[in-house]
């Protein structure tokens, strides 16, 4: 379902006259105050439009590896990244680079954060999130499945976009 203010509807129609943006979506009109209440005003700014989405299906890292027959699999592992905005930005970038999944520590991943979803700009719907209890153990497991583990550093001399990411990589 999509909730929006009448002002937001007018702006969307004005900016996208040739598109019928909500043709197959249930749209409910609400006041700005009602949208504030839906979002938790202190937590996130809604800009006049709020979408209610279903919870994403979760799969374990082991299930993903077992069922995935692709020759090239690229994953990202995050450690000590806890800010929802930063994680959302990483998710957005990962989707742009066709990354297959994100491995995060279960206890430090802000899965209920609305800021995470907003920062990801819809990207969270296009990537698998693997919540693990121990990142080190998960990386060791992936190495037994022929994954290469690389790390990024701000002082690195090599541009990661120039690397050949064929095969199985983290």
Report the location of each language-model feature.
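N-terminal positively charged helical leader segments and presequences
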Residues: 1-69
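RNA substrate-binding interface of SAM-dependent RNA methyltransferases
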Residues: 1-24, 68-160
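A contiguous loop/helix-start segment that scaffolds small-molecule binding in enzyme catalytic cores
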Residues: 164-170
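Residues that scaffold the ATP/ADP-binding catalytic core of kinase and kinase-like folds
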Residues: 38, 119, 163
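Short, solvent-exposed beta-strand edge segments and adjacent coil->beta transition regions
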Residues: 46-48, 73, 124, 167
């Amino acid at each position: 379902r999509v909730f929006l203010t009448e002002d937001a509807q007018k702006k969307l129609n004005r900016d996208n006259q040739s598109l019928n943006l909500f043709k197959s979506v249930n749209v409910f009109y609400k006041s700005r105050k009602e949208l504030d209440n839906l979002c938790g005003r202190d937590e996130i700014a809604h800009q006049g439009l709020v979408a209610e989405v279903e919870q994403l299906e979760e799969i374990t890292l082991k299930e993903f590896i077992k069922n995935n027959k692709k020759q090239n699999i690229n994953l990202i592992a995050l450690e000590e990244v806890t800010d929802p905005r930063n994680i959302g930005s990483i998710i957005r970038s990962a989707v742009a680079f066709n990354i297959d999944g994100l491995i995060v520590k279960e206890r430090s991943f802000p899965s209920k954060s609305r800021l995470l979803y907003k920062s990801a700009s819809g990207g969270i719907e296009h990537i698998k999130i693997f919540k693990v209890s121990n990142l080190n153990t998960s990386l060791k497991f992936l190495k037994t499945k022929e994954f290469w583990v690389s790390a990024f550093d701000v002082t690195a001399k090599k541009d990661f976009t120039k690397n050949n990411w064929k095969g199985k990589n983290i």
